[in-house]
Amino acid sequence: MNIFRDKKTHINIATIGHFNHGKTTLSAAIAMTLANKKYRLDKKSIKVTLEEKNQGIGIYTHHFQYETTLRHYSHTDCPGHTDYINNMIAGISQVDSTILVVSAVDGSMSQTKEHLLIAKLLGISSFIVFINKEDQLDDDKFVYLVQKEISQFLMSHGFQTNKIPIVSGSALLALETLIQQPNVLRGENYWVDKIYTLIELLDSYIPKPKRKKDKHFLMWIDSVKFLPNIGPIAMGRIEQGTIKVGEFIDIVGFRETRTAKIISLEFFNQSCMQVLAGDDIGVSIEGTKNHNDIKKGMIISTPGTIKSWLEFEAQVYILKREEGGRTSPFFKGYCPQFFFKTTCVTGRIEAIEYTTGSKTWMIMPGDKLKIQVNLVYPIGIKKRMRFLIREGGVLVGVGIISNLIK
């Protein structure tokens, strides 16, 4: 395995934005541009991503890697369709920064706003905007108008627009050029040069993340793949700590916690003996044979460091209508979906209390309250953990766990 981490900063990044605005095409164009410069490319992942693009809809999050002269990137291509928002939330919950893709023809759409809001609520503060499909504009002057519209949109969501880079281009024309002319150089094609500009911004604009390498090992499982004669491989990004082959971990969530041994580790299909915080990895665990043993949303962690919980208290903020939230109140007994990292679980709101301490039975959009939640099954969570609340296709609110009950 090429150990990049001794020489290059590792960054987890995602493409987000509205359905059919070109996220997958841009992801492929970035990777193929860097492959042309002889940097590493996970060609199998790009092939799968492009096949899904040809089917006309992105359903799953796809992961692949690439390198620049300065950094190594793990790239998550998030689905934009509203029916698969659960996969998008799971994917974006584990990244350091994002590329917001907006069509120059359509401008900001419903999923543009929701994806941006989700990223903001999950604590992602740095991102780059790529205005795609520039080639479809009749006049170059329209590019400026689209940039202005995007800036106003970002400003309305509380972002400092002077600190957010905006690049325009055509991911499709760049990708077609790279496929037809694999050896095209910078300066030889206008659209490929736009991708180079974006790549330079990835290196210069996105801050170096602070990794928690000295804490106990913790990873939320994002997906599970099955390999013949091996069994399930748990995939995910390491939240904190390090782990080695042969060490023991707890499998937490959905059922009784089990302790098992790490059989093997992989980093983008390459075997390795040790992995660190921030790495996107695959883990083979002793004793896991099927979907009941290991599944998306479970946690693997250093034994005894995290538990499963059914009930918790949290401080929450309920989004207003103009923020993309509900238009009407809800009441005690309300059962939305709660999103914790890669886990989505239904919960019942059992108690509601204002910040002043007085109890209430009704929650209005814009309220800040303390709630008590009873989940339908136990999951691995911890104090001060951030989560999203969603129901009926609407982002209801955001919260932070203040107390774990049982």
From Swiss-Prot:
Residues 8-210 form the tr-type G domain. It comes from the Eukaryota. It is an enzyme of class 3 (hydrolase). It catalyses: GTP + H2O = GDP + phosphate + H(+). Keywords: Chloroplast, Elongation factor, GTP-binding, Hydrolase, Magnesium, Metal-binding, Nucleotide-binding, Plastid, Protein biosynthesis. GTP hydrolase that promotes the GTP-dependent binding of aminoacyl-tRNA to the A-site of ribosomes during protein biosynthesis. This is Elongation factor Tu, chloroplastic.
